[in-house]
Design a protein with these regions (language model features):
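Poly-acidic low-complexity segments
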Residues: 4, 23, 154, 188, ...
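A short N-terminal beta->alpha junction/helix N-cap motif
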Residues: 17-25, 50-54, 261, 265
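Short catalytic-loop micro-motif centered on adjacent basic/acidic residues
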Residues: 19-23, 81-82, 103, 204-207, ...
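C-terminal alpha-helical cap/extension of soluble enzyme domains
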Residues: 213-287
C-alpha cells in the first residue's frame, strides 16, 4: 500500500540518514526499485516526472501499475509515489489519480504567487493524507524543459515556504540535474546550514543526486537533508548495460532478442545502482 512520505522523512531527518527518491520510467524501472527496496529493507520514494507520466500514458496508469506491483511482490517496506517537479495542474491530476505524495515546483513564480499556490495545495494534501514538497530557488540543469542554473535559495524565502505547512523542502544549494560540468563549484554548505537553522525539523531535499561526491552527500545528510533524488545515474547504468548486451551480439544469439532478455542487464544495473545509493544514504534496514 502506498504511504505518504512524511513519516519516513521525519524519521530519516531525526535519524541522520536520507531516503532515496528514484524516478521511474516504465515497468522495468519500477520493478527494479521496488525489489531492491524490499531486499535492502529500506523505505523508498518512486518519483514520476510529468514527462514520464505522459510517456506511461498518464498518472492513473502509473498508480495502477505501482499498486499492482506492491501487491504481487508482497512489498512490506514503506513506498511513496511522488510527482517530481509538478506544475500546479500536474499536482491536481496526481491528487485525483491516487498518488501519495506530490512536489509543487513553484520556483519560477514570484515568491507571492508561489506562496499562494503552495498554501492551497497544503490544505488539499492535509485533507487527503498526502505529503507535499515545495521548492525554493531553481535547481540547475534541465528538467522536462525547465532550465535552471544551479542557484542558491534565499534562506528567508525557504522559511516562508516551510512555515506554510509543507512536509519537505527542496532548496537550491548549487546542485543541478543531470551530469555535473567539470567546472562545477560544489554544494554550498553555508546556504544549506543557514536554511537548516531557519527551518528546524523540516526534512530538506537534495535534487540532482547523480554525480555529487560521496563526502558531500554525507555532509548534506548531516546538515538536514533527508531525501535525495536520483534519476540520471539509473538511466546511465541502464543504457550502458543495454549497449553492452547489444554490442556483444547477444540479441542475435538464440532468443536473445526477447525483450525480457534484452532488458535484463539494464534492469540488474538499475538494481545495483539503487542498492549502492541506499547504502550511501544510510536507509538500509530503516523500513
Amino acid at each position: 500500500m502506498l504511504v505518504s512520505a512524511k513519516e519516513m522523512l521525519d524519521k530519516a531527518k531525526a535519524g541522520h540518514y536520507a531516503v532515496g527518491q528514484f524516478n521511474i520510467n516504465n515497468l522495468e524501472w519500477t520493478k527494479a526499485i521496488l525489489l531492491t527496496a524490499q531486499e535492502c529493507n529500506s523505505p523508498v520514494i518512486l518519483g514520476v516526472s510529468e514527462g514520464a507520466g505522459k510517456y506511461m500514458t498518464g498518472y492513473k496508469t502509473v498508480v495502477g501499475m505501482v499498486n499492482g506491483m506492491l501487491e504481487e511482490l508482497n512489498s512490506t517496506v514503506p513506498v511513496a509515489l511522488h510527482l517530481d517537479h509538478g506544475s500546479y495542474e500536474g499536482c491536481m491530476k496526481c491528487i485525483e489519480a491516487g498518488f501519495s505524495s506530490i512536489m509543487f515546483d513553484g520556483s519560477h513564480y514570484p515568491i507571492e504567487e508561489n506562496v499562494a499556490k503552495t498554501k492551497e495545495l497544503v490544505a488539499i494534501c492535509a485533507e487527503k493524507g498526502m505529503s507535499l514538497e515545495a521548492e525554493v530557488g531553481s535547481i540547475g540543469g534541465e528538467e522536462d524543459g525547465v532550465v535552471g542554473r544551479g542557484e542558491c535559495a534565499d534562506p528567508n524565502e525557504c522559511k516562508a515556504i516551510a512555515d506554510l505547512g509543507v512536509d519537505m523542502l527542496a532548496a537550491g544549494i548549487g546542485n543541478i540535474h543531470g551530469k555535473y560540468p567539470e567546472n562545477w563549484e560544489g554544494l554550498s554548505f553555508e546556504t544549506l546550514d543557514a536554511i537548516q537553522q531557519l527551518t528546524g525539523d523540516m526534512p530538506l531535499v537534495l535534487h540532482g543526486g547523480t554525480g555529487i561526491p560521496e563526502d558531500m552527500i554525507k555532509k548534506a545528510i548531516d546538515l538536514g537533508v533527508a531525501k535525495i533524488n536520483v534519476n540520471t545515474e539509473c538511466q546511465l547504468a541502464f543504457a550502458a548495460a543495454t549497449r553492452e548486451y547489444v554490442e556483444a551480439g547477444k540479441d542475435l544469439q538464440g532468443k536473445g532478442f526477447d525483450p525480457r532478455k534484452l532488458l535484463a542487464p539494464g534492469f540488474e544495473a538499475i538494481k545495483e545502482t539503487v542498492k549502492v545509493k541506499m547504502e550511501l544514504f544510510g536507509s538500509v534496514n530503516k523500513a
